[in-house]
Amino acid sequence: MQDKDLSTVQTFKRLWPIISPFKLGLVVSGIALVINALADAGLISLLKPLLDEGFGKADVSFLRTMSYVVVLVIFLRGISNFISSYCLSWVSGKVVMIMRRRIFKHLMFMPVPFFDQNSSGRLLSRITYDSELVANSSSGALITIVREGAYIISLLAVMLYTSWQLSIVLFLIGPIIAVLIRFVSKRFRELSKNMQNSMGELTSTAEQMLKGHKVVLSFGGQIVEEERFNHVSNDMRRKGMKMAVADAISNPVVQIIASFALAAVLYLATVPTIMDQNLTAGSFTVVFSSMLAMMRPLKSLTNVNAQFQKGMAACQTLFALLDLETEKDLGTHKGENVQGYLSFKNVTFTYQSRDEPALRNLSFDVEKGKTVALVGRSGSGKSTIANLVTRFYDVDQGEITLDGINIQDYRLSSLRKNCAVVSQQVHLFNDTIANNIAYAAKDKYSREEIIKAAKDAYAMEFIEKLEHGLDTVIGENGVNLSGGQRQRLAIARALLRNSPVLILDEATSALDTESERSIQLALEKLQKERTVIVIAHRLSTIENADEILVIEHGEIKERGSHSELLALNGAYKQLHHIQVNH
């Protein structure tokens, strides 16, 4: 997943349509920030009358009046600060929400090979960290630019009005600072991209340990995982230091340049021609205080570049992800009243990460209501066949047809609606049992239909023992259930769909012997109405299949019924002999 090298302007132009619906909030916030800056500058400008009139002439009445003015200005400053903070938080929250929704939706439609090549930790970082970084960095930069920019302009106006002779020197440092900021812009963006990548790696490493903590404990892998995490976190630290160094160098340079301006003001104040211009103690205090006050916004404006570049770098990463092509769905066939005639014709397929084909010139047919079992050693290509039927992957050569129509001509939603899959890797959601069985279609099925599917999968045996029955929340990925119970819910989910094609990818592998026997009885009833592909490790579960295909290195080595294959005295009999004797 490569990031496009776009300029900051191009990136912001693309981000603007997401922000623009909330521009009223930005305008209100901008006005409030300007008022806030004017209030700050106003407080400094009050120093001249306070010193010259109030204290210099000991005017008690004037001092009393100024006390009310100071309270009013500070009150105005507080109100404007609240309004600007609230409006910007509202806009930022909206932008983060939209970005996260777009990324989440886009990821749901990405093809399976994309997830093979990108870790879930890295993708989670895109949804959480990068989306937040775009909004926070952009809003933070806006606050700095508008508020500090308005503050500097206000201070300049106060200085010029008070004593333009002392103030004129300040204009000399502006172009120098602008050149410096432009010089470091590109570097900040590059470093920020590296930080985002490191964050993705850090998240991925931590996620692997958390998901596989039982394996870590079982094999004593704590030291290995600690070293792996330490390496990734140290890499992130070093990249963070590079950003800190770039930031630390730019700030002192700006401040040194500004210090020369301050020194010049002090020196010019001693020049008689300037002192003759009615320069009072109040005037000098206002000019000098304004220049001191200007150091903070100048520093902030220097930092805003780094802050803004972080957001733009994150934005480029997210747009690069959004630009990736989603799953191809060019088919138009609706697939209504599918009978279930499935055919593989000279199918060859190779995974992107491998050189050797997973399937080679594979051909076989499955008639309606028939069961074909696929057996073979791990890595022979059995599960690949199941993935091709549902178009999780597309064939390189040949074709797969359903009812005589190429599956690529079907709409993806229609094809998958007609193919129910139960794999050895069961995934359940943190929801009720009923909603997991009727996943993505809970309004389509009645309570009675859900119960029937659960009974047919022999899941009601344990569901009825739970305190809340079908309404029991099972935790993330069914953490509160046993492996066999989770597998039965997955089978119930597939049965409820009542699809004409049923794919069982070692679906009974996690069941105990008694449960497996019950499931086999249920599946035998269903096989008369469905086209079934069974991928099995235990040969005892597929002895009654209409045809058994022995897959080896992506090719069909043997085919026939259970008895026919035993009579061949070949690979199937060897597998059978090994399992019987164990």
Swiss-Prot record:
Q: Which SMART domains match?
A: AAA
Q: Where in the cell is it found?
A: Cell inner membrane
What topology does the record note for this protein and the membrane? Answer: Multi-pass membrane protein
User: For the ABC transmembrane type-1 domain, which residue ranges apply?
Assistant: 27-310
Gene3D superfamilies given in the database record: ABC transporter type 1, transmembrane domain (1.20.1560.10), P-loop containing nucleotide triphosphate hydrolases (3.40.50.300)
| Gene Ontology cellular component annotations, sorted alphabetically | plasma membrane
Q: List the transmembrane segments.
A: 15-35, 68-88, 140-160, 161-181, 254-274
Sequence positions that bind ATP: G376, R377, S378, G379, S380, G381, K382, S383
Q: Which domain of life is it from?
A: Bacteria
Looking at its record, which EC class is this enzyme?
Answer: translocase
GO molecular function term, any single one: ATPase-coupled lipid transmembrane transporter activity
Pfam families the record matches: ABC_membrane (PF00664), ABC_tran (PF00005)
E.C. number: 7.5.2.6
Per the record, the domain comment is: In MsbA the ATP-binding domain (NBD) and the transmembrane domain (TMD) are fused.
The entry assigns this protein to a family as follows:
Belongs to the ABC transporter superfamily. Lipid exporter (TC 3.A.1.106) family.
Instruction: List the protein's name.
Output: ATP-dependent lipid A-core flippase
What organism does the record attribute this protein to?
Pasteurella multocida (strain Pm70)
Task: State the encoding gene.
Answer: msbA
